[in-house]
Amino acid sequence: MGKIIGIDLGTTNSCVAIMDGNTTRVIENSEGARTTPSIIAYQEDGEILVGASAKRQAVTNPRNTIYAAKRLIGRKFDEKEVQKDIDLMPYTISRADNGDAWVEVRGQKLAPPQISAEVLRKMKKTAEDYLGEPVTEAVITVPAYFNDAQRQATKDAGRIAGLEVKRIINEPTAAALAFGLDKTDKGDRKIAVYDLGGGTFDVSIIEIADVDGEKQFEVLSTNGDTFLGGEDFDQRIIDYIITEFKKEQGVDLAKDVLALQRLKEAAEKAKIELSNSAQTDINLPYITADASGPKHLNIKLTRSKLESLVEDLIERTIAPCRTAIKDAGVSVSDIDDVILVGGMTRMPKVQEKVKEFFGKDPRKDVNPDEAVAVGAAVQGQVLSGDRKDVLLLDVTPLSLGIETLGGVMTKMITKNTTIPTKFAQTFSTADDNQPAVTIKVFQGEREMASGNKMLGEFNLEGIPPAARGVPQIEVAFDIDANGILNVSAKDKASGKENKITIKANSGLSEDEIQKMVKDAELNAADDKKKLELVQARNQGEAAVHSVKKSLGEHGDKLDAGEKTAIESAVKDLEEALKGEDKDAIDAKTTALMTASQKLGEKMYADAQAAGGPEAAAAAAAGAAGASAGAAAADDNVVDAEVKEVKKD
């Protein structure tokens, strides 16, 4: 069985890790980085770019470059958080037929799970390249405060990417696994995980206990905000720059999509720089132009100004911390360690606020960008049976219940209940001779059902005629270890039963998922063809270069017919290289190698006469350069021109 990889599917950046024995390894991607930007770009020719390459071209292709898709996953178009993002994002967010928030790219509508699947596919490929074997199974992390619809949508993204998602695990819990695994302290420890990422905030209170030599990680409580993160901090900087520029130049950059994309990059860069310095310059020449000519932007931003811009955002993280402490039944003084997760926790003001609330310095020995992926890899090892000394007890973040008479939310499973769990309760009818009941399932903490998130509904029909209150209808809730809910209803008298696995009352249908899986497979096949074409082209170009060089140096040794044949073969290959036909390029490369054999023989003979066997061997190697280039295909060696451009 192959390894189960751990993936941190982040709003801003993603990361993949594996367990190698008892050692964790975060895997570098093809660009050599340990994290990959969660950015996807759709090119005019149909090519899909993921990660750093997508980020690099965002300024010139803002409408077709998707970032922060995780903020939309499992959400309805009408939700206020989505409506807020519509005004901020350069790409188009539209309503799908099922009411979900989807994204429009180059004339087609894409579901957020479909977009996130591109990032997951990149993570999968990164792991496969490192392991040298196919990867089909993964543990994927989600914010602890993700609801059922968002968790289901994340699983769908995994399926579309060709992964069997063995477990959905909460990000703070994964970070706790990464932190606690190598700690040798005896006795129980209570830790707080403060996770402020690119798009979401979570806090979890977790107890790590030694139980008969086994490390038990029990989540006592969790809380958070799934629409608060680094993207919001960036937006505050962008808004500030727009306001200042309008004051100075009288031009509103908010209406210029290309300028906004440059501002986003500059804001993120400034935010990162201000974690280490007191002041930074935001310098964007030719940001826009009007009738008077081009306009340049140059603004100084100090750390104190940034802190004043985002003060309320940082403050918003404290209320969930307070609630999590209360729900866990502990006091702040009971917390032994505070762990910071997510890139935003590098901001000094955030660290200061966390210290102020918890009364102690947060730990510095956890990598905020990598801990979540490492914890997911640990859980993968547990699920594969390769690790027996870890037990993870997670919780459901929000209460689950059904709507009863008068629109009341009757809670079946309360928040912070350890999962997996089951609960059943008996209900009855509201009217005489009622033949059916509709079970509406909600998630949330409000007393009235309408104030909570509706997850789904189904009917139980065929109830025998009886006075109101007489029929006995048992409703059962069953939450699995992924936090995904199954609900059933059964009439005890007739034995009639109905059940559903709760997806969003919209979500992706099975047919839609299967279509997306097929599309993804076609894309993978297309990518493979493109790679093979590039390899063939590289080898063809190497052959042309090698033969032309040798012809220039030794062509006078050939008779006219031989030289003409080689020149003709070179011309044919150069013509083939202009096209997209890999087979034609391969054939012309082979033809050139055959035609240039005489040239190789002449070079060998000349060298042997001049300097003996060693020189002859070197000459032969030079003449055979084209052949070697073609043979390299078998060894998966690709010649490529690489040019590094460094920006100040």
UniProtKB/Swiss-Prot annotation:
Gene3D superfamilies from the UniProt entry: 1.20.1270.10, 3.30.420.40, Actin, Chain A, domain 4, Substrate Binding Domain Of DNAk, Chain A, domain 1
Pfam families reported for this sequence: HSP70 (PF00012)
Stretches that traverse the bilayer: none
Disulphide bonds in the chain: none
UniProt xrefs under InterPro entries: ATPase_NBD, Chaperone_DnaK, Heat_shock_70_CS, HSP70_C_sf, HSP70_peptide-bd_sf, Hsp_70_fam
Gene Ontology molecular functions: ATP binding; ATP-dependent protein folding chaperone; unfolded protein binding
Family the entry assigns: Belongs to the heat shock protein 70 family.
Known role: Acts as a chaperone.
Family annotation (HAMAP family): DnaK
PANTHER family: HEAT SHOCK PROTEIN 70KDA
Name of the protein this chain belongs to: Chaperone protein DnaK
Organism the protein comes from: Delftia acidovorans (strain DSM 14801 / SPH-1)
Gene field: dnaK
